Amino acid sequence: SAASDVYRRQAEDRDDVIWHEIHNAYRTRKIITGKLGGIEQLDNRKTVAVVDYKGFRVIIPIKEMMINLGRSPSGQEYADLMLRQNKILGNMLGADIDFIVRGIDSKTRSVVASRKEAMLRKRQIFYLDTDAAGMYRVYEGRIVQARVIAVAEKVVRVEVFGVETSILARDLAWDWIGDAHERFS
């Protein structure tokens, strides 16, 4: 029908506009934000995070997700670490994730990105560089906004301008919190 043709064309136009945004972000190395939608294993056995950016699938290799769990062990310790990493990623599902586009394929409209690069850039801007007055933007005692990226019963994981940290449930409020899920999600 004519109506469905119009609808299809509008959707294609919208996709073209969003693809143009992605392409520009790739060219300018601009930080963009999407929602963590899943964890998948590719045919080559590599695990990747899948982020949704306005309807486009963005693939982020696990090592570019910056889930920092310390040193890189081997054997059983490595298996345990991978399990912990996947659990953390599982708790992060639905979280807003900043990333920098590292590669695009215009034919297939596929996108590969790095969260790590975005996090390091934000650290540089907010913790290491100074503003016009020569002041750091983030410093001890300053109240800043944090992005909740994962919630478990006893702990909330937040990102503060490129730095991830955990806050224990008992430190989140003056009153008793039995389960952090009830207050933070």
Residue ranges and their predicted role:
Residues 2-7:
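Short, small-residue-biased leader/transition segments that mark boundaries at the very start
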Residues 8-35, 78-91, 117-140, 178-183:
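Short boundary/loop segments of OB/S1/cold-shock single-stranded nucleic-acid-binding domains
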Residues 26-47, 94-105, 137-153, 185:
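Structural detector for short beta-strands of small beta-barrel domains
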Residues 37-39, 51-54, 62-63:
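Acidic/polar N-terminal loop/beta-strand segments that form early-domain functional surfaces
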Residues 43-51, 109-111, 154-158:
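Short aromatic-glycine-enriched beta-strand elements
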Residues 47, 58-104, 110-117, 181-184:
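Acidic-enriched and Gly/Ser
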Residues 56-65, 122-123, 164-176:
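A short macromolecule-binding patch
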Residues 132-176, 181-185:
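Surface-exposed interaction/gating patches
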